Swiss-Prot record:
Family classification: Belongs to the UPF0301 (AlgH) family.
Coiled-coil region: none
GO cellular component terms attached to this protein's record: cytosol
InterPro entries to which the protein is assigned, alphabetical: AlgH-like (IPR003774)
NCBIfam families for the chain: PRK00228.1-4
Disulfide bonds: none
Top-level taxon of the source organism: Bacteria
SUPFAM superfamilies according to UniProt: VC0467-like
Protein name: UPF0301 protein BAB1_0506
Length: 200
């Protein structure tokens, strides 16, 4: 796995990559966070924290936004019953987004990488409720955003580590251990990290 990839035009920016917050991250909202970057260009960047949970459960969220009624809660497919809702970031926190495998496409679906897509409409929630939808998916409320040049500056100031994003790490259910496992996967001993973290 490639680490510490610096954003640049030649490398196509950081679309489809992970950001891992350095231990000295001063913004508590991003402490020990793993962020999946969906869009990164000279106009800025956006992504989702994938290892923080929202207090709301997926079935309750479906009911709150009118996808299902109270009576439907007992007949939800097993997958929908156990799907969790992530805290994607501090921006637009009432808006829902679904990162998913590329076997599901609607008009509003945006490809992020060769095998990951993003859909932010209610159609995909209805598909998951109906027992269909993509094979792999994660739901997030809110997103993380950076102004032009901001993310590049934070990476340069050692606020973030960057690395490739294997699908198993993106979609697996071990949310609490994801940060430590990615550090270990990159061969990083956190006790020996020297940092002067930037701001997120």
């Amino acid at each position: 796995m490639t680490t510490h990839r610096k954003p640049s035009q030649e490398q196509g920016f950081l679309n489809g990559q992970f950001l891992l917050a350095m231990p000295g991250m001063s913004d508590e909202r991003f402490a020990r966070s793993v962020v999946y970057i969906c869009a990164h260009s000279d106009e800025g960047a956006m992504g989702f924290i994938i290892n923080q949970l929202q207090p709301v459960q997926f079935p309750d969220l479906l009911r709150q936004i009118g996808v299902i009624g109270e009576e439907d809660l007992i007949i939800l497919p097993d997958r929908a019953q156990h799907m969790v809702v992530r805290n994607g970031g501090p921006v637009d926190r009432t808006r829902g987004f679904v990162l998913h495998s590329d076997d599901y496409m609607v008009d509003s679906t945006m490809p992020v990488s060769d095998d990951v897509c993003l859909t932010a409409t209610v159609d995909i929630l209805r598909a998951i409720y109906g027992g269909g939808g993509p094979e792999r998916a994660l739901m997030a409320l809110g997103y993380s955003g950076w102004a032009p040049g901001q993310l590049e500056m934070e990476v340069a100031e050692n606020g973030w580590l960057t690395c490739d994003a294997p699908l198993d790490m993106l979609f697996d259910s071990d949310i609490e251990g994801k940060y430590s496992r990615l550090m270990l996967h990159m061969g990083i001993d956190m006790s020996r990290l020297v940092f002067d973290a930037g701001h997120a």
